[in-house]
Amino acid sequence: MSSVFNAQSFLRTVSSSAGVYRMYDVKGDVIYVGKAKDLKKRLSSYFRKNLDNVKTQALVSHIHHIDVTLTHSETDALLLENDYIKQYMPKYNVLLRDDKSYPYILLSQHEHPRLAYHRGPQREKGHYFGPYPNGGAVRESLHLMQKLFPIRQCDDLYYKSRSRPCLQYQLSRCSAPCVGKVSNADYDEQVKLASLFLKGKDQQVISTLVAKMEQAAQQQEYEQAARFRDQIMALRKVAEQQEVSNNKGDMDVIGVHYASGIACFHLLFIREGKIFGSRSYYPSVPAQTDMDEVLRSFILQFYLNADIQRTIPKEVVISHNFEELHELEAAVSIALNKKFSIKTNVRADRASFLRLAVTNATNAVITRLSHKNTVEQRFVLLEEILELSTPIHRMECFDISHTMGESSVASCVVFNREGPHKGEYRRYNIEGITPGDDYAAMKQAITRRFDKIEAGGKIPDILFIDGGLGQLRIAQKIVDEKFVHLDKAPQLIGVAKGEGRKPGLETLILGDTETSFSLEGDSPALHLIQHIRDESHRFAITGHRNRRQKTRNTSTLESIPGIGPKRRKALLQHLGGLQEVKGASVAELVKVPGISIEMAQTIHDALRG
């Protein structure tokens, strides 16, 4: 305890009413915020002799002074405590750092509406579906929507500039309303069905399509009927894969695991009886904090964070009971002005969802504890930053290396959750492009890598491109083409060099949205990205140098198409050497056995070009 703080003198002035207290250190910073039904009793407990809690001992040793605010009830104290915690972010409180806005799917208000990823203020007119738990869930949903409903996902500027259908039309992902390939009525019908699907009413969508298919068949419009049939089959396949509850309401299911100072709250967002998405939260927990405080702090901060747009259901199911559960229910209900209930003892579907959430929370904590500061942990952090809904198992990175366009080589290196997987590394000798054209080189390498990709093949979860937006766009276009028949496609990320090419200043660009962002220079996730990028660069340079040296040590003749070892030997023997071959005319070259007039012309042009 600070020598300037007189606890006994302070406690004599404290009321036994309900209220909130704020503890300050010598610098005037709030280091802890708490609430109490009886302030005098609660604050006296901090200054007992023989404190056995390490956290409390550390806290008390830094107290310089304490401010107290009285409230009408314990419920009011809970709400005020939460406000102060958000305001001051005290070091000894449990803190949920969840200040990111949540992503939505936007169905725009337009003559031909588009589906788009949206995060931030909802300024654009249209319908917003969500919020989704993370960006990965939105990207997966948009990828699925492209397969189910041929609605455009391009921005309005791109839409206005079209004079002919783009690649998405060729891939049957868009009906090309920009150039009149679909009637307004048919397009509007698909928009309505997509809207119903996003609201969770997939059975209604299927019923509508079945009726349309039967009507088209009766009118002998068999191609149209076949399109409806394929759409119905795709929708039914999706519906079968979704885990559905008999309870059609909305609820959040929270599984909690807390061990060795690491707490994980794994949330399943159940909407219309389906798992809408899931997300793990890791609040900052001071050492020796008890479970009840961790639970109470999370519930308050998660559901009363007014800065984040979030759909809050009336029902929350959580894996642990705690002392102030009913007070929390009342406080959140008052703050939200709606009914809010927290349940712990549940059966049937709720119990099944709860077991799943607890399993995920437990596994998350075990993983964090056992792989801290390892490659595995860096993968976990990268998944969180990229907001992926599934773990990363395989990452690949491409780079191009050449000297003034000579001997271009592309590298592809592979990382798994143990680090570099060198047995999977590949190099591609780049041929037939304008020397120094990195875009064409990247296009050739990516095309060769995924030319015959199949569902059971080695598909990376993340594909890094060492370069800027131009190279990333080329790679994204190829991936879109090659993966159109598959349910899975890699997430592309461009790694653009920072100012002065200094490590730690890289800009990362998402291939599907072209959103750019940066990570802190000391971020373990950035270190993982730098590792795979540097390894790709090293592997490309090594391959380029080997190829360049081999080329320079090889006869010029062997670089001419159609000239192999036999013809090379014949030319040198017949004409007397390389310089004589270079000086020979077409007529002289034709006299060499095995050399046609066309080949002679090719040799002549190549050696004198």
UniProtKB/Swiss-Prot annotation:
Domain UVR positions: 203-238
Gene Ontology molecular-function annotations: DNA binding; excinuclease ABC activity
GO cellular component terms, semicolon-separated: cytoplasm; excinuclease repair complex
Main location: cytoplasm
CDD domains named in the record: GIY-YIG_UvrC_Cho
Subunit structure: Interacts with UvrB in an incision complex.
Function in brief: The UvrABC repair system catalyzes the recognition and processing of DNA lesions. UvrC both incises the 5' and 3' sides of the lesion. The N-terminal half is responsible for the 3' incision and the C-terminal half is responsible for the 5' incision.
Name of the protein in its database record: UvrABC system protein C
Lineage: Bacteria, Pseudomonadati, Pseudomonadota, Gammaproteobacteria, Alteromonadales
